[in-house]
């Protein structure tokens, strides 16, 4: 994103931490195929009288669909299909029970808060750990999900290695 273009943040130093931009925003990925598909979506929503948000039923699905609609500058009413099963009966019931998108605002805000928190943690902790504990020029990537997952994998590897070592010693 544009945050990396900020002159003050180009060099990695402890003095620049914490890195907190004045505002957060969304930006389309700079890839031709994605931009082309988004232009198709943008043209379709420009002429829509109503949109039915059929994104995944959950925080992440709500966030992604809202971001797409924000970037596409959706002006028409939006209703939400909320289903967790793809059976014919479930889909029919879901379309009979569409809700206004405002009913899901708190879910969107929760997802947005998580995304911003992940960014703040990731960029600041990655720079801190890379500068403090890494080798010059090497990045020690830190994140809310990846770091504890890696810790679980390392712990499991150590447990298996220790078990093999103990089994070898008793032979």
Each PLM stretch: what is its role?
Residues 1-119, 123:
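Intrinsically disordered, low-complexity regulatory segments
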Residues 3-7, 163-170:
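Conserved small/polar residues in nucleotide/adenosyl-binding loops
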Residues 54-56, 144, 168:
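Alpha-helical architecture
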Residues 91-161, 165-166:
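C-terminal or mid-to-C-terminal helical accessory/interaction module adjacent to the motor/catalytic core
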